[in-house]
Regions:
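Short coil/turn segments at alpha/beta junctions that flank glycine-rich nucleotide-binding fingerprints
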Residues: 23-27, 99, 146
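Amphipathic alpha-helical linker/stalk segments
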Residues: 59-88, 139-142
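Helix-turn-helix
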Residues: 1, 12, 20-54, 58-59
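Generic hydrophobic, amphipathic alpha-helix propensity
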Residues: 9-18, 34, 59-63, 67, ...
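Short secondary-structure transition hinges
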Residues: 54, 93-135, 141, 156, ...
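Hydrophobic alpha-helical connector segments
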Residues: 73-104, 132-133, 154-161, 191, ...
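Short hydrophobic clusters on alpha-helical segments that form packing/core surfaces
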Residues: 13, 17-21, 92, 201
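C-terminal peripheral helix-coil segments that are non-catalytic and often amphipathic
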Residues: 91-94, 130, 134-150, 164-217
Length: 217
């Protein structure tokens, strides 16, 4: 029972920390507010996480783990390249839609120069959650070598796909205003967004022979 309570306390602290870092970023976050929101105190937080930096890095680690879980699953499935790319794009958009707070934290982190991400990559570079990007890169490079994709820069392609998926959510308020997107109809818009990105990426990556096959089906 004590172990269960310890895990519950730790999770409450992490949940409160997410809200704090979303609103204030790392530099503006206060441990006292996290303690109050989690129904604990600063001594308990320091007992579990040792420091504000360790707590923040634990939050970042959870973001990477959640973001890469679906990627790992897709890479482990025996699917065609087209189905793999479609699965990755659709599930990444689902992740962004369901976790807006995590995207906000990443924006704060990027604004600070990504110093904590750099530290985490050095610390956990060989762990699965931080190794998925390398696996995805190798997948694209291998398929390019086999002629299943056009000869493109794999790194640039991954960054482009991530940007296309994330841009709407990063700039959602202005996008809804500029493009007159009804918040009540957003689910349908996001559904169409998935289709548009998949279509654009597949037609940009597939060799001409594969494009012709897709048109015929």
């Amino acid at each position: 029972m004590k172990q269960v309570n310890s895990q519950e306390t730790k999770q409450r602290i992490l949940n409160a920390a997410v809200g704090e870092f979303v609103e204030y970023g790392y530099d503006g976050a206060h441990m006292q507010r996290i303690a109050e929101k989690s129904g604990s105190n600063k001594s308990i937080i320091y007992y579990y996480f040792k420091s504000k930096e360790n707590l923040y890095e634990e939050v970042l680690s959870s973001i990477f783990e959640k973001a890469f879980d679906n990627v790992e699953m897709a890479l482990n499935k025996k699917m065609s390249l087209k189905k793999t790319l479609t699965y990755l794009i659709e599930n990444y958009i689902n992740f962004l839609e369901q976790n807006p707070s995590l995207l906000r934290i990443m924006m704060w982190e990027n604004a600070s120069g990504g110093k904590h991400i750099k530290k985490l990559m050095k610390k956990h570079g060989s762990d699965s959650a931080f190794n998925v990007a390398e696996k995805l890169l190798r997948l694209l490079e291998d398929t390019i070598k086999r002629g299943e994709l056009r000869h493109v820069d794999a790194t640039q392609t991954i960054i482009s796909v991530v940007g296309m998926c994330a841009f709407y959510f990063i700039t959602k308020p202005s996008n809804q205003i500029v493009w007159n997107i009804d918040p009540e109809a957003e689910a349908e818009f996001i559904k169409q967004r998935k289709k548009a990105i998949v279509d654009l990426i597949l037609h940009g990556l597939l060799p001409e022979t594969e494009k012709a096959k897709n048109k015929d089906h």
